[in-house]
């Protein structure tokens, strides 16, 4: 049996900072009259004929079950007294830059994941502070004192655990996961809390009887690889607190895409359009996960003879709407010259990305 080595670097000190309900918190800070009231960042459905989606909301609104990517119409139905604010991205970006400068006081090894969250590697920090927890507390203090906002912090020896830790106690929490506590911490977590495990993977894991980190720990590595491929390799390690991904300084994501290679070639238009739909939904979900919008849709088609065609369309407005991405990608495919060779690869990529408040219209 093939056995892959388990290499666990526990020497690093990683902090994950996640701003608490960032856009809504900025609005509350600038308008104290909003405090204690349900605030939703998104277009008011009463002014748009029920169109639009929720970008984010404050914790008061979340008590009503409102969450990001929910239709504004449903958010209003859940909480008619909610206050809808379209949002001011330029203001949020300015505040985000202010927070980034605070991070840079402690380390230059900062990987922003979006406008309101980032990983920091403070193993060799600028101030020579040995305790990552102390640095996390100082950052929380600085952000509150200078920016007037709260954030949650997770501290551990890798990005995976630090991210989980920052989600553990919100808002304004700080959670430390030591190497000796990692297995116990992960064992109790529902599998859907594992960062990177999507809805379809959760369903598949549940079908396998895997509901918690403890359940995952009991599954042989090759079983996970057989079911999930490379992702199974990662899952096996994450269940053991192993993730050696580095913090990439000032990483800027330039594109988000999804592509698939087919062992059985695609010939029928219905099959091709079905795969375009799957890729479009995957891209839309990734855009949502990374809090991005995109403007340029790129379709990639590789035929059985290895002829590869790539064509792009730039939209007039930013989007992360799955139906729109699918429609445009389908139109691109229809515009391509016919090729009798079967298709071995299909992919959709979104470029011209921006962090932005989602004020996308939806047909509801």
From Swiss-Prot:
Its cofactor is Mg(2+). PROSITE patterns: UMUC (PS50173). It catalyses: DNA(n) + a 2'-deoxyribonucleoside 5'-triphosphate = DNA(n+1) + diphosphate. Keywords: Cytoplasm, DNA damage, DNA repair, DNA replication, DNA-binding, DNA-directed DNA polymerase, Magnesium, Metal-binding, Mutator protein, Nucleotidyltransferase, Transferase. InterPro entries: DNA/RNA_pol_sf (IPR043502), DNA_pol_Y-fam_lit_finger_sf (IPR036775), DNA_pol_Y-fam_little_finger (IPR017961), DNA_polymerase-Y (IPR050116), DNApol_IV (IPR022880), PolY_HhH_motif (IPR024728), Rev_trsase/Diguanyl_cyclase (IPR043128), UmuC (IPR001126). It comes from the Bacteria. Binds 2 magnesium ions per subunit. Coiled coil: none annotated. One of its GO terms (cellular component) is cytosol. The record marks 23 as: Substrate discrimination. Residues 14-198 form the UmuC domain. The keyword Manganese does not apply. The keyword Transferase applies. It is found in: Cytoplasm. One of its GO terms (molecular function) is damaged DNA binding. GO terms for biological process: DNA-templated DNA replication; error-prone translesion synthesis; SOS response. The active site is at 117. Mg(2+) binds at residues 18, 116. NCBIfam families: PRK02406.1 (NF002677), PRK14133.1 (NF010731). Belongs to the DNA polymerase type-Y family. PANTHER family: DNA POLYMERASE KAPPA, DNA REPAIR POLYMERASE UMUC / TRANSFERASE FAMILY MEMBER. Monomer. Poorly processive, error-prone DNA polymerase involved in untargeted mutagenesis. Copies undamaged DNA at stalled replication forks, which arise in vivo from mismatched or misaligned primer ends. These misaligned primers can be extended by PolIV. Exhibits no 3'-5' exonuclease (proofreading) activity. May be involved in translesional synthesis, in conjunction with the beta clamp from PolIII. This is DNA polymerase IV. It comes from Streptococcus pyogenes serotype M28 (strain MGAS6180).
């Amino acid at each position: 049996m093939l056995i892959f080595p388990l290499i666990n670097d526990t020497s690093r000190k990683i902090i994950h900072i996640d701003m608490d309900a960032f856009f809504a918190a900025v609005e509350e800070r600038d308008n104290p009259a909003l405090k204690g009231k349900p605030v939703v960042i998104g277009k008011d459905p009463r002014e748009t004929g029920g169109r639009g989606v929720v970008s984010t909301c404050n914790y008061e609104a979340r008590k009503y079950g409102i969450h990001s990517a929910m239709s504004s119409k449903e958010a209003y139905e859940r909480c008619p007294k909610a206050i809808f604010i379209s949002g001011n991205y330029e203001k949020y970006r300015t505040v985000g830059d202010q927070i980034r400068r605070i991070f840079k006081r402690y380390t230059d090894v900062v990987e922003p994941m979006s406008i309101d969250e980032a990983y920091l590697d403070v193993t060799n920090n600028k101030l020579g502070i040995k305790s990552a927890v102390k640095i996390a507390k100082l950052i929380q203090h600085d952000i509150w004192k200078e920016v007037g906002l709260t954030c949650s912090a997770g501290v551990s020896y890798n990005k995976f655990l630090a991210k989980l830790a920052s989600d553990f106690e919100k808002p304004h929490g700080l959670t430390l996961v030591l190497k000796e506590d990692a297995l116990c911490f992960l064992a109790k977590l529902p599998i859907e809390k594992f960062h990177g495990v999507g809805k379809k993977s959760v369903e598949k894991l549940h079908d396998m009887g895997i509901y918690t980190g403890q359940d995952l720990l009991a599954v042989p590595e090759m079983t996970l690889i057989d079911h999930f491929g490379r992702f199974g390799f990662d899952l096996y390690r994450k269940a053991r607190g192993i993730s050696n991904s580095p913090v990439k300084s000032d990483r800027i994501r330039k594109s988000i895409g999804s592509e698939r290679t087919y062992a059985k070639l695609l010939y029928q238009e219905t099959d091709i359009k079905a795969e375009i739909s799957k890729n479009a939904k995957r891209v839309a979900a990734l855009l949502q996960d990374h809090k991005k919008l995109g403007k340029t849709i790129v379709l990639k088609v590789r035929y059985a003879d290895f002829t590869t065609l790539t064509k792009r369309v730039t939209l007039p407005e930013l989007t992360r709407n799955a139906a729109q991405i699918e429609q445009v990608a389908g139109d691109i495919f229809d515009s391509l010259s016919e090729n009798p060779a079967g298709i071995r690869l299909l992919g959709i990529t979104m470029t011209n990305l921006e962090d932005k408040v989602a004020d996308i219209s939806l047909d509801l």
